[in-house]
Amino acid sequence: MKIRPFGVEQWMNEYETRCTYNLAETCVESLTVRQLLDLTGHTDLLQDLLPMKLTYGEIEGSDRLRSAVAALYAEQSPQNVLITHGAIGANHLIYLSLVEPGDRVVAIVPSYQQHYSIPESIGAEVRLVHLREENNWQPDLDELADAIGGRAKVVSLTNPNNPTGSLVDASTLAQISQLCDAAGAYLLCDEVYRGIDQQGPGTTASVA
């Protein structure tokens, strides 16, 4: 297995902590733990953690955490939640679990590099569907259907998109889901930036 160098991470590792002005940053300024607790109103959280034993823990993640994650979605239960080491770990696990050499993986790009480099390293046939400025960075569903071709194993997208920030609405997500269902393909929707476009209560519609 050989994975292409992760260009953006290598660049960020070399330069992001050494510059005066970082115009490429996608994250907000970091908070201290105290600021975060004050912001959420859970100032007694530390006292809740101190009696906790540092055991091996549940393989799938604690019931409390899985229930909290499930509550972020309209129709999900803790049984459908698996705790991983971030979205990177979750994506990696999905590709290693589902993709075999020769399988077709369709990646909507630009996107996080692992969504095409990992399947490529496994030996998958990777098809890229490009978002275009003239289409407001929205996926062309006809082009997507052609790439799926009735035989894709996995279709991946990031929503909100990384790096353009474009957002696929609930109606288009439903159409993409239908294309995947028709082909018997898994839809991997990386929603790590879900909520950054939030206005008012609630968060961005999820494909889940």
Regions found by a protein language model. Name each.
Residues 97-119:
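Conserved PLP-anchoring active-site segment centered on the Schiff-base-forming lysine
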Residues 23-26, 69, 81, 105, ...:
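Generic structural signal for small/hydrophobic residues in well-ordered secondary structure
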Residues 133-203:
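Active-site phosphate-binding strand-loop segment of PLP-dependent enzymes
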Residues 120-126:
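A short helix-loop-beta submotif of the ANL/AMP-binding
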Residues 77-81, 101-104, 151:
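Short acidic capping loops at alpha-helix termini that bridge into adjacent secondary structure
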Residues 2-86, 93:
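N-terminal small-domain helix-loop-helix segment of the aminotransferase-like
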